Amino acid sequence: MRSAATALRLEPVAAALLLVWLLVVNVGTLGGVYFYTHAPVPAVWAGAVAAWGGAFACFGAAALLQFLVGFYAGLLALPLLWHAPSRARLLALAPWVAGLALVYVPFTLSGLADTGALSNDAFVEIYAYLRHPHHLVPSTWPWSLWQRKGLFYLGAWYLLHRTSAGRPTLERTVLHFALALAALTLAANWLFVEIVPSSLVTKLQPARVTPLVQVVVLALLATRVASFLARRHWLLAAAVAVAPFSLFPGLVLALAGVLSPALLAPSAPRWPLWLLGAATVVAFRPFGGDFDYHAARHAPWLGLWLVACLPAWLATRPATLCTAAAVAVGLALTAASAPDRLPLGLSRRFAPNQPPLDAPGRLGARFRAHSTPNAVVLAAPSDEMWSFKLHARRALVVDDKNIAFTAAGLREWRDRFTHILGVPFVPGVDPGAAWRAQPPNQLLAIARHYGATHLVDRFDWHATPPGHLIDREGDWGLWALPPP
């Protein structure tokens, strides 16, 4: 982050703002993807405690080279190499191409090994329409989402264009290239998923370029905030700084672009200041929701920005810096070792094995403590089963989160869902309704077919599930199944 701030010539306040934007803001992303996600990543903790950590180490190395991230990030960086010397360009491109090859060659070979497992159309149907519609099917994304993202990029482009006097030409080149790349990849997403299905394009998940494009736009906006602060245009800097957190970021940025000539003039009139200030306040909808709502929505990023401003101040005070570091490390270690003694907000941030918060998660945590590692569970097709599996650390017959993303793996996943639901698992089917329609004796037969020893279900879905009840939490129950 410090290197990026130095390259962009950002002062500490603007650098802290960019950091907060990258951690919190998602105004420019589509397809349910984010530059930084606040959700836990179970694989990290699983890799730390697994006896076969070498496999996770190899998986981590592959993730660093993964095609989805390395390919798009490399494309966005290409404009930076256009005017570079040939040797520097070669030294930059060689590792990128080598990394792509390390992923793309096995990727292609695994596809060849799966020849005949699924047709191209069937692969796209399962991978996109059944498993990842939120990532891959643009027609399922709300129109309001498209409008908000489009207005953000349009408003940001207009502001950057209107305030580009004296800025490097490369800056405009990078901006236009990033926006054009986003438009082209989203068009390819729609064309090769919904019109002419292509398994290759589907696997690349083109919408994943949008978080990286958002990074480019936010970094350029941070340079404008730094410039406005240096010229003491406080209100203009504040409006641009808080715009991405508002409900209408694109409109605030566009209005700032419209008013920027008047606001940046040596003798600026007062009415543009009042207009921009009023529009910024209204963009946060101050008259909707009570004080608690606004505090919960905006206090975290404001507090994070204040904390992010501290390193620059602490850097000039070594003794204070050491004290602050010791306090931070002490709090983290305390929260990790004794999460029950601290507020939930702290324990959830620092505890590597945070406690479950929902009924299936608490059920899974108790099941893990009283079951063998080889236990297999037949679970209802519900999103909440992810929490159960996370805390139980036991195998499920099938669930909607975990799947082998090969042709053979996708086919097995679809076949298992079809088996437990009793109806073909196709787009539009209601898994919950199909599960509820299955009689208890059929659930027992399915469990025995896959070697399941336990069943997780809701009491309002089946009045008399097979087996005997061994635990319950809220509306959820856990049954031990009779041996065959």
Regions found by a protein language model. Give the residues of each.
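Membrane-embedded helix bundles of polyisoprenyl
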Residues: 2, 14-81, 93-108, 281
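Transmembrane alpha-helical segments
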Residues: 4-5, 46-52, 74-82, 156-157, ...
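Membrane-interfacial loop-to-transmembrane alpha-helix junctions, especially the N-terminal start
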Residues: 8-16, 92-93, 168-184, 226-240, ...
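Transmembrane helix interruption/hinge and helix-loop junction motifs
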Residues: 9-10, 50-52, 65-69, 86, ...
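Transmembrane catalytic cores of multi-pass membrane glycosyltransferases
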Residues: 27, 67-73, 82-218, 222, ...
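Transmembrane helical bundles and short interhelical boundary loops of multi-pass, membrane-embedded
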Residues: 239-384, 395
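Short periplasmic/luminal acceptor-recognition loop of GT-C membrane glycosyltransferases, typified by
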Residues: 333-345, 354-431, 445-461
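Aromatic/acidic, Gly/Pro-rich catalytic loop(s) in extracytoplasmic/lumenal soluble domains
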Residues: 439-484
